[in-house]
Amino acid sequence: MNKKVVIVSAVRTPIGSFMGALSTVTASQLGAAAIKGALDKISLDPKHVDEVIMGNVVQAGVGQAPARQASRYAGLPDSVVATTVNKVCASGMKAVMQAAQAIQIGDAEVVVAGGMENMSLIPHYVQMRTGAKFGPATMIDGLQKDGLTDAYDNNAMGVCADLCATEYQISREDQDAFAIESYQRSARAWDAGKFDNEVVPVAVPQRKGDPVMVTKDEEYTNVRLDKIPSLNAVFTKEGTVTAANASTINDGAAALVLMSEDKANELGLKPLAYIKGFADAEQEPKWFTTSPAKALPKALDKAGVSKDQVDFFEFNEAFSVVGLANMQILGLDAEKVNVNGGAVSLVHPLGCSGARIIVTLINVLEQNNGKIGAAAICNGGGGASAIVIEKA
């Protein structure tokens, strides 16, 4: 059994800056907003949903079963199965892949999948289980430890990005130019209304008065492009990665509704896209930056599609050098990659991003009369995930 899988709805929340507009909304509540938005967009009764699969990376303090929380907060029945996925930055994409697999083999007919993260609310840890025998107790930043640090050599992810820049001879100037272009593309896309169809608002409760509705991304306006070339490197002494040519710390969620083509026909729902193929890849952890260049060819092969047949690509810009290196390795045209900007400007809530780039890709195909799209995202530990879709 290998049923055709279609995406019938795909949305994301606005992405909030670190300690910004969405900083008080938990990851699960952000996920709920995305799930509800995805279902409401197609007027789908939640009773039809068999399962919810959501990526979420740093789960400390979020509470038991974050995906289950998001499902219930979105108003789905208690009978809906819920699973949380942690594949670091690729979690949201892996959730979509697992949803597709469940539908392909007949385990489910309708699955909501995506990802969510509130990086502003990630706590600090202190080991007090056995007590501090003497002197002060040391606090550990959960965001740094569980989200942004290699588990094997304890280096920041940015150290690996600097290594990648050296290996592929990508200059500081190239990275800064890439970052500036990312910000400019995002600003143009927002000004042209190109994100209007994919973004659902989030109501943020206030201490007094009515909730504030957050409707737009924050980060792409929080930049002075003229200052980018003057910033210092932040990870290694002779490095080229800066705060501006890397993605930032953020809050947000994305959700997609997947179902079998037969079920979509039964419910009278028009597919947005078909899932053609997907794949994962792994290599040595310090080279996670180029793992998308290993995962994407595998996904294309499974989809029966050549690189040249792909109209548009979405690569998660964890760092500018990630986009540049993978385009270099794969020989891609920059005009076909992240045409509405990428994570450097649209930002990178860890568990959300893998799903977010699929949502954006669907809209890019629609806006630009494209047919085939491919998305790929690297993840800490040496991995990456990639997916190929075809506009319906």
Name each model feature, range by range.
Residues V110-L163:
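Flexible glycine-/small-residue-enriched beta->alpha junction loops
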Residues K87-E117, A165-K194, A255-D262, M327, ...:
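Active-site-proximal alpha-helical scaffold in enzymes
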